[in-house]
Amino acid sequence: MGTMLNDFRFGIRMLLKNPAFTAVAVLSLALGIGANTAIFQLLNAVRLKTLPVRNAQELAQVGLRASDLQLTRGSKGLLRYAPMTNPLWEQIRDRQLGFAGMAAWGMAGFNLAQGGEVRPARGLWVSGDFFNVLGVQPELGRVFNQSDDQRGCTAPGVVISHGFWQSEFGGSSDVVGRKVTLSDRQLQVIGVTPPGFFGLEVGKSFDVALPICADAMFSGANQRLDSGTNWWLMVTGRLKPGWTIAQANSQVSTISAPLFQQTLPSNYPAASVNDYLNSKLEVVDGSSGYSILRDNYERPLWLLLAIAGLVLLITCANLANLLLARASTREREIAVRQAVGASRFRIVRQLLVETILLAAIGTSLGLVLAQALGTFLVASIGTTRDVVFLDVAPDLRVLGFTASVAVLTCIVFGLTPALRATRVSPGAAMKVAGRGLTAGRERFSLRRGLVVIQVALSLVLVASALLFSRSLNKLLKLDAGFNQENLLIARVGFNRLKIDPANRLAFRGQVLERIKATPGVKDVSEMDSIPLTGGGRGNAVWLEGRTSADKVDASFNRVGADYFKTLDIPLVSGRSFSTTDSRSSTNVAIINQTLAQMLREPNPVGKRFVVEATPGEGETTYEIVGMARDAKFEDLRESALPVVYLASFQDAYPSSGRQFLIRSNLPPTNLSASINQGLREFNPGLDVNLQVFRSMVEESLLRERLMAKLSGSFGVLALVLASIGLYGLLSYGVTSRSKEIGIRMALGAGTRNVLSLILHEAVLLVLIGVAVGVPVVLYVSRFAKSLLFDLSPTDPVSLVIAGLVLMSVALVAGYLPARRATKVDPLVALRDE
C-alpha cells in the first residue's frame, strides 16, 4: 500500500511538472467521456430506464394487434400506440384473468385559469385504480380510488403533479382542498404526486389528473364514456404473481372475439364491421411505458453514441501518442530506475498510475460536462409548445457506463505506451541519452500508426457530419409547393364563450374578419390542419359510378375560401371556395393533382366522388369544383400525398376553436402583437396563441437539427484532435531528425526541399488514413440511411469534401513543424551529434 501511495504522489508531481501535457490530456478526456456520458444519459432516459413506479417489470400494456390499427383511423398521423374506446376498456378490465389490477389513461388538454390569466394545462384522464395499480403514493393528500371514478360524477377532485404544485402553488403545504379552474370548472385539489412521477408516457409530463368519469362533465353531448367509436384510452396492467406476458397475451387473445362482438357500435359502417369483429388484443411489455419520443429518437441516439465513441477512440489514440512521445523523453530516467533494480512491472505500474490519475481527473470533469450537455440535449428535442420531460440525472447504470468507459480508456491509451517505454535495455537508453531510441526503431512507427487511425476515424466523423448537415439543408431549402415566408398561425379558442354549435360558423367568420382588418395582414384563411405539421383526418374516396374497390386513401383538410390564395398554391383548373358554399348548398371539394392521378381522372372538375362511411358519419358525396397544384401536406419528407380540401362553410360539426393561416405584408413577429390585441378587444374571452409558421416547420426538424449539430460538433472535435496528433508527431519527428535535416541542408537542400520533406510525411499519413477510412465510411454510413433525406449514405460529394478537409488539416498541422525544420542550423545539428 505504501509503495502504491508513493506511486500516486510521484505521478501527481510528474503531471504538475508538465502542465501543458496534463491540460491537453485532461481536457481531451473530459470532452470525450463527457460527450459519451451525456448521450448515454439521454438514451438511458428514453430507452433503458423503467418507469419510476413500484416493480415496473410487472407492468404490461394491452392494445390492438398491430395489423388492426386501421380501426383508429379517425385521424391520420404517426400514432404507434392505438388507444381503446371506453366500452372496450371496461370489458377488458372486467373479463381479463392475468392481471392483479388494470388502469386506463388518456391525454387531455385544459384551459387553466390561474393568477388572472388563462393558459394551457397538460392533463390526464385516469381510471380510479390508476395510481394504486402503479403503486404511486401521494406526496400530499390522497390519490384516486375506484369510488372517485363512477358514472355520473359531478364534483370530481383533481390530483396535481409535483411540478404543477411547485409552479402554481409555490409548494404550499395547504394545497389540498384548494381550487383550480380548468376550462371554466372549479375543482378541488385532493392530492399531489411524488416528484419523480411523470405518468406513463416517457418524454411527457402532466399538470393535473382527473377521473375518466369527468369526461361527461367537460364534453357534454360529445362525452366519450358510451362511445364505441372514440379511441382515446391507453390500457396498462400489473401481472398477477406467476403470470408471464405470454400467458396474459394468450388469455386476452382468447377473449378478444366476444369483447369486440359485445362492444360493436350500432352505427358502425357495414363495410368495416368484419374488420372490427376480427380484431385481436395483444399484451406487450409495459415496464418502459409508452413513448412517441422513443420511436423518433432511439435510433438517432444509438447512432450518436457510436459517433461519440469514435471521438473517444480518437482521443485515446491522441493521448497514446502524447504518452509515447513523453515516454521517449523519459527513457534515460526509466533506464536509471531499471539499472538500480526496479522491475519492469514496478515501472509499468508507475506509468499506469499516471494514466489513472489523468483518467480520474478527466472523468470527473467529464461527468460535470455531461450534466450541462444532457440538459442541452433535452432542450434540443423539445419546444416551448411541446416541452420534453426527461430525468437525465445519473443513476447506477449511467455511473457504471462512465466507469467502464474510464477503465477502457485507461487500458487503450495507457497500457501500450507503458509497456513500450520499458522495452528498451538500460544500456541502450543510457547511450542515446534520451534522444528517442524508441521512436526511431521503425520507419512506420506505432505513433504513425496511431495518427493513421485518428485520420481514418476522423474521416468517418467528418463524412457523417456532412451527410447530416447536407440532409438538413436540403429539407430547409425544399420547395414545399407553397410560399412559407411571412406566414403566421393563429390558434383561437372560444370554448369559454359557450357559443351554441349552430352559431359557431358565423362567429368564426367574425374572428376571421377581425384578423383581416389588422394593418399588415394581406390574406387570411381558416383551416383544420396546419401544413407540414403532421396529423389531419384521413379516409377512403372513390369516383361516383365506380365501386369501392377503386377507392384511394386520402388526407382531408377543411379550409376557408382564401386558403390557396394565402399559401400561393395555384389552381390547375376549376375554382376556389366561396362564401356561397354553405351547408344548404351542394357539398363541394377541391382535390390535388396526385389524387386526380390516383383516381385516374385527368379532368376531375365537375365529377363527383364518394367518401367512405365512418362510425361517426355515413357515406358522403362531394362535387369536385377545382384541382390544386400538389403541395406538401403533412411533412417535408413525404412524397406528394392525395389530398381532399373541403369548404369550411359547410362544416356540419364546427368546433369551439379554430386555426387561422395569415399572410403578412410585414415580418410575422411584428404582426403578432397587433393581431393578439385586436382579438382581445373583439372579445376578451378568446384564448389566442400565435406562432410564426416557419418556426413551426423548423421545430418539426428537431431530430435532423440534433443530428446535424452534434455530428458537426463531433466532426470538428475529431479534426482538432487529429491535427494535434499530427502536429505532435511531426514536431517530434523534426526534433529527432535534426541531424538528418542538418546533413541535407549542408549538402545543399533548400528551404523548399525541407518543407516538402516534412509536409510529404503529413500528406502521406493522411492519404493512408483516408484510404483506410473510406471502406469504413461506406460500411457504417448505411446505418444512417433512414435518417437522411434525398441523400445516399454513400454520397461521393460528402466523402470527397471530407477527404479534402482532412488534407487541409494535414497541411496546416504540418506547416509549423516544417517551418521549424527549415530553421535547423546544420553546424549546430552536426555538433550536437
PLM regions and their residue ranges:
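Structured, solvent-exposed hinge/loop segments at the ends of secondary-structure elements
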Residues: 36-176, 181-188, 196, 228-231, ...
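Internal alpha-helical transmembrane segments of multipass membrane proteins
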Residues: 23, 27-31, 298-322, 708-728, ...
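Interfacial "coupling" helices/loops that link adjacent transmembrane helices in transporter permeases
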Residues: 315-359, 725-763, 770, 783, ...
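Membrane-helix entry/capping segments
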Residues: 1-21, 53, 117-120, 151-153, ...
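Alpha-helical transmembrane segments of integral membrane proteins
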Residues: 1-22, 289-293, 322-349, 353, ...
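Short, strongly hydrophobic transmembrane alpha-helices
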Residues: 18-46, 50-52, 315-316, 359-363, ...
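Small-residue-rich transmembrane alpha-helices
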Residues: 39-42, 282, 320, 356-429, ...
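"Rare, low-scoring activations can occur
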Residues: 189-199, 216-294, 511-524, 593-594, ...
